[in-house]
Amino acid sequence: MNYREDIRNIAIIAHVDHGKTTLVDALLKQSGIFRKNQVVNERVMDSNAIERERGITILSKNTAVHYNGVKINIIDTPGHADFGGEVERVLKMVNGVVLLVDAFEGPMPQTKFVLKKSFELNLPVIVCINKIDRPEARPEEVVDEVLDLFIELGASEDVLDAPFVYASAKRGVAGKKLDEEMTSMEPLFQTILNYIPAPVEASNESFKLLISTIDYNDYVGRIGIGKIESGTLKENDSVYIVNSTKPGYEEKVKISKIYEFEGLERDEVESSSSGSIVAITGIEDINIGDTLTSEQDKEPLEFVKISEPTLSMNFSVNDSPFAGKVGKFVTSRQLRQRLFRELQTDVSLRVEETNSTDSFKVSGRGELHLSVLIENMRREGYEFQVSKPQVLFKTIDSKKYEPIERVTIDVSSEYVGAIIEKLGRRKGELVTMQEPQGGYQRLEFLIPARGLIGYRTEFMTDTKGNGILNSVFEDYAPYKGDIPRRVNASIVSFDTGVASTYGLNNAQQRGSLFVGPGEEVYEGQVVGESPKGVEIEVSVTKEKKQTNVRASGSDEALKLLPVKNLTLEEALEFIEDDELIEITPEDFRIRKEILSSQQRYKSKNKKKWFYAKDIFWCNKIFCTILFNNIFNKYNFFSSSSVFSKEKTYFNLAVGNGN
């Protein structure tokens, strides 16, 4: 079998914030992609605005560098568990991975997840211990922890012999030993060439390409990205689209342009052959998971199974009093088109129709996954509202199962007690607790996914912002029972108008506020949170009554406390089942699902009435069975019994519901 020794295809995988994008920056700079006098931003691969703001990678990205005559195609992947679907699908394009591990934190939940996916595809692994220049770094211990993780995941002997490289991506240096002098990334380049296998040379076989990523360009439309598994592709070639999930489906299409990756650019080429990662244009309806084939062999390539969503929320048309004021796209048709268009690029997302034409059920991998979608739509000009996130349950053997998360917490020892207590109340189970290192202690919990909803903000408060919490989906387990709801309740406006200093001053006596003076509010809008756990209705638009009478002294100036500005994730954690978040291009507001206070009052009383009625009928049935059993056992209701009259009265009472 022949191999293309001029190509290597690799993916950089790791837990969030372990330095993947910074490592790619260093590889790009030292491969000669940039001019010597060229100013290059940090984390140059994170080109998306939200990625730069949040400091995380959301979308996987392709680049390529040249070293010693070999082209190295590199895929930078997300590290956050919510975007694990991006990692799963791009692993089909590569022949090996570089696993990045923080020299202080060691293997984290997402490290285990991405490593497991790599093992399932039998990909060779290079382990890079990054951030060795951190003062608290412990690289030798981290190496042992990585090997323990390999054994836990059932790695073969060949995988256990994986090479280890030590690096400081920020400084742009690497070495094969800790005590050697490190001056560049050359040791990592050499390890990639020596250890990652070259793709198979199969350019003379039938053409096949699996689409793993979709991009979009206003000029050329949809762009399919994937690795050519076999054969050769030329411009204007006619190929067939088939899909392993659609038996019998095929469509003949024509390739317009072919691009290969060079640095941060895409270079147009006339043809490309097996082993190359390419981007193609000209196919209007191309999707992730499609296989492009020649006419001779139309057998589709298997696409990797993507993990199922664990969380859902309803996206619906905005029906608040302020609806349509600033939004560009506000109708249910526009909302539907945008959500279903997202399915073409996000394989982890699910969108379902509901009983209402104005509402859609959207399921994802976590709060961050869905909040990034919301933020993207908001910036595009969409106006809509979303409900409280709900966990997706499963029924297995007629029993209710729920998703379980593995949570890893690094925190100062003084906060450990409070965290164990809080997560215990949320049905969390402490699995491991490591000895303190550098003043920090690591805790590992297994906890229902619904137990984490609303906890992250509470965690940051309890640890005074000094704790680190990471979670990743573990498995489904039997339902753990009820979990206590939030302690704080909503402060709700019962009128519409402009918030005044006088009204806000009175309202802030009840709790912290979300709105400031001069902001427009409407009836049913949540304007703050009360620490007492009881929902409160206030008027924040109330003005001080003016009279002709003047006090002997001047009025004191009113002092308002700072407004509590919630992030979108914090708002999603805060809201209850009867609340929504109104999303607009300019801002978002928390509101009640039923805006009218009178309608909410009637709805609550109606629920109480049905509850009381259910209790009455249950008690009536119970009493009927109990009395009949007692009277029949002792034959109290014989014709001569003194209780015959009582039985008649009892039956009449029960039968008439009195």
Report residues per predicted region.
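Structural and coupling elements of P-loop NTPases
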Residues: 1-609
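Compositionally biased, low-complexity flexible segments
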Residues: 627-634, 643
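Low-complexity, intrinsically disordered segments with a bias for serine/threonine
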Residues: 642-648
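Short, intrinsically disordered C-terminal tails of secreted or membrane-associated proteins
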Residues: 650-657
